[in-house]
Amino acid sequence: MVHKIEISIDVIVHATEDMSKILQSFEDVLDVKREDFAIEETEGHYENPIILLNAKIVKKQAQNFMNKLLESLSKEQVNELIDEIAERTIDSRFHVRLDKQELIKGNLAIREKDTIQLKIHTPVYNKKDTVKIFTEIFQIAN
């Protein structure tokens, strides 16, 4: 069964990081283009410059993103995500964080620090179906 998927991508780029490398890595690894991102310049707590990158992808592009994501993660990492569906899902949104430095190297890895935040949304009308629906999504490419 194909599910309607919408994906939000949020990245904080610090002054010491090269935004163009990060954007190029998204295109190379996950096929998300520079023009898909909204770019906002702001300041951190100590007035340090930071850039917020945000993208929202839908329909066929979101399906392609999921396929690339699941193909790039190890089978163990995908199984770990499946095991953690209940803990990672809030209001039909599955939350996962990817290592920003690994993406720049052309790899994907699940991490909790200095990360790229992904929110994968699909309509779940009955909360008890959440695990089943997200398991189906993750097993498409597994």
List PLM regions with ranges.
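Long, hydrophobic N-terminal alpha-helical segment
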Residues: 1-36
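Short glycine-/aliphatic-rich beta-strand segments at the starts of folded cytosolic domains
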Residues: 7-12, 53, 90-94, 116-120
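Beta-strand elements of well-folded, non-transmembrane domains
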Residues: 11-15, 30, 57-61, 100-104, ...
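Short, conserved charged micro-motifs
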Residues: 17-21, 61-68, 105, 127-131
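A common structural junction motif
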Residues: 29-34, 73-77, 114-117, 138-142
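Short, charge-patterned binding micro-sites
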Residues: 36-61
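Mid-chain, well-packed structural core segment of small domains
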Residues: 68-101
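Glycine-rich, aromatic-bearing surface loops/beta-hairpins
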Residues: 95-142
